[in-house]
From Swiss-Prot:
Residues 8-155 form the Globin domain. It comes from the Eukaryota. Monomer. The modification N-acetylglycine is found at G1. InterPro entries: Erythrocruorin (IPR002336), Globin (IPR000971), Globin-like_sf (IPR009050), Globin/Proto (IPR012292), Mb-like_M (IPR044399). This is Globin. SUPFAM superfamilies: Globin-like (SSF46458). GO terms for molecular function: heme binding; metal ion binding; oxygen binding; oxygen carrier activity. One of its GO terms (cellular component) is hemoglobin complex. Belongs to the globin family.
Length: 157
């Protein structure tokens, strides 16, 4: 299953993910805010899941304190998952908690996959992240497994 996919990430793949993530995490709130604004542009329907931001134009949210707070929470959570890659059981626990927390908001696997897609596009253009080739493949493998674990947990609940 997808837990096995996470466990099958090689040391090199995990190192590549962590190294590229470090460029993002250096300004997690700024980069995270940029990703959320772009996410709302890429997937306008998904903005309605965020009641605080529903009905606002994405560009109006640049510099918004609530957006910055939410970005630090969303990407802080992802940061914790990446930090726990060497402990797949802990990572799965974090994913399952995140999956459960998002059920009442109607957020499902599709929205996670869409956010991950925007994140990867952003990281590919982020200086120092070097998300290409084997690093991009490692990210794709990890994020796909994460989205599937979230989906399985939401269906189980």
């Amino acid at each position: 299953g997808d837990v096995d996919v996470l466990k099958s990430l090689s040391a090199d793949q995990k190192a590549a993910i962590k190294s590229s993530w470090a460029a993002f995490a250096a300004d997690i709130t700024g980069n995270g805010s940029n990703v959320l604004v772009q996410f709302f542009k890429d997937y306008p329907g998904d903005q309605s899941y965020f009641k605080k931001f529903d009905g606002k134009k994405p560009d109006e949210l640049k510099g918004d304190a609530q957006l910055a707070t939410h970005a630090s929470q969303v990407f802080g959570s992802l940061n914790n998952m990446i930090d726990s890659m060497d402990d797949p059981d802990k990572m799965v626990g974090l994913l399952c908690k995140n999956a459960s927390d998002h059920i009442p908001r109607g957020v499902r696997q599709q929205q996670y996959k869409e956010l991950f897609s925007t994140l990867m596009n952003y990281m590919q253009s982020l200086p120092g992240a070097n998300v290409a080739g084997d690093t991009k493949a490692a990210w794709d493998k990890a994020l796909n497994a994460m989205a599937n674990i979230i989906d399985a947990e939401q269906k189980r609940l």
